[in-house]
């Protein structure tokens, strides 16, 4: 789920050679309401047949976190990306977790698996 248009997001994933890791891409053009409205997240979860409580949503912008929380997903703020400078301190976003680098995701997933 991205704020970019779907076709642009797909082009970026192709250019980065990571598109094979994504089952579904939904951009802002496929939903009536932009984030922080949870429409795009709910649409992706429905398409993937995943309950929001079983999902982790990573976001670099406060609107990502608000959207994740609005649909009951685990909201994980990330320090890489664009949002922190525009949205104030990441610690004020009310995310369930904050990741400093992509490598921190695996330990978080393992920790969350232990709780279930």
Language-model regions: role of each:
Residues 105-115:
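Short amphipathic alpha-helix with an adjacent loop that forms part of the alpha/beta core around
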Residues 1-13:
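Substrate-recognition element of Asp-dependent hydrolases with the DxDx(T/V) motif
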Residues 8-11, 43, 67, 107-108:
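Phosphate- and divalent-cation-binding pockets in alpha/beta enzyme and binding domains
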Residues 3, 29, 61, 79-82, ...:
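Short secondary-structure boundary segments
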